Amino acid sequence: MSSREEVVNFAAGPAAMITSVVEEFGKDFVNFQGLGMGVAEISHRSKQGSGIVTSAESNFRKLYNIPENFHILFMQGGGTEQFAACLYNVYAHHALKNGNAKSLVANYIITGAWSKKAYAEAERLGFPCHVAVDMKELAGKYGSLPEDKDLKFTPDGETSLVYYCDNETVHGVEFNEPPTNIPKGAIRVCDVSSNFISRKIDFTKHDIIFAGAQKNAGPAGITVVFVRDSVLARPTPAELHKLNIPVSPTVSDYKIMADNHSLYNTLPVATLHAINLGLEYMLEHGGLVALEASSIEKSKLLYDTLDKHDLYISVVEPAARSRMNVTFRIEPQELESEFLAEAEKHHLVQLKGYRSVGGIRASLYNAISVEQTRRLIDLLESFAKAHSN
């Protein structure tokens, strides 16, 4: 049996959590605020339950300096549910001013597996959609970012939304800046699930931002959505039916969730409490400035180690490398299973790459310290030495 102190969990999600946060949550799971009930047993509509929601909203605003013209929603269904939710809400919003909203086209910037899945969902649901760029088609594989000239958007006034994934968890690709030259009138949608709470967000360049909590914020079960207030405006469902615009399911409707303080249906307040404990910890330990500095330090140490050994092949162009999900191969690839087995012996776990791409992936989320990253680096060094020609 291994102790928590021995094991370094490099999982891509659900991922490692800060130990002191887990310990505090464990106490509250048994007895929350002296109620004689655990936090998972209290009503989401109770004073304590709604207090968790209010506190988490406040802490997110402090951490990100979120403008007052953005709502914070706590939803369910993961990032995958947001693939559909953003479409329903955006088309309903456009219908308020454009009777021909159903002809507007959703544009997707595809840089890896998750943005591709988002596009596939739009196709499956029958929304008009267009690929502004697919980096696999452009470059032969996922591992780079598009230049402005690569982005082939539909024209101004004909575009419903522009969607991109800020950090591709599977392929280890991360944007350095939001895409530019977005068509006029388009709603800007961004999936930040796997680099959430790791750097500042420019809210002037986004309208909908969402993140599944299970990577950098806490346990699975809640999706955090930041949505510009203006996007919440939409016709009634009856009016949308007349315009032949799809009506969002109730639990995916941003306006309903905003009007009900994220408590329209049963919110997993225990999960949100765990997230909020993490927010409090991060605010007390330097906030986003400290978190970004740590992520840069950890990823630089790891990439520098990979780059100096021919045994390791980084599969992402340097300018597109993720700070969160470091992906690489070992040549010859037969050595990868040996490396993973050796890592397990050293209590370095969950390093196997995503099932569709293979290889090695080390996820350096906030709960992974510089010291823990150095433990992986030490193994990489010794493994390279043992297999040098």
From Swiss-Prot:
GO terms for biological process: L-serine biosynthetic process. It catalyses: O-phospho-L-serine + 2-oxoglutarate = 3-phosphooxypyruvate + L-glutamate; 4-(phosphooxy)-L-threonine + 2-oxoglutarate = (R)-3-hydroxy-2-oxo-4-phosphooxybutanoate + L-glutamate. PROSITE patterns: AA_TRANSFER_CLASS_5. One of its GO terms (cellular component) is cytoplasm. Keywords: Amino-acid biosynthesis, Aminotransferase, Pyridoxal phosphate, Serine biosynthesis, Transferase. GO terms for molecular function: O-phospho-L-serine:2-oxoglutarate aminotransferase activity; pyridoxal phosphate binding. The modification N6-(pyridoxal phosphate)lysine is found at residue 215. SUPFAM superfamilies: PLP-dependent transferases. NCBIfam families: PRK05355.1, serC_1. Belongs to the class-V pyridoxal-phosphate-dependent aminotransferase family. SerC subfamily. This is Putative phosphoserine aminotransferase. It comes from Schizosaccharomyces pombe (strain 972 / ATCC 24843) (Fission yeast).
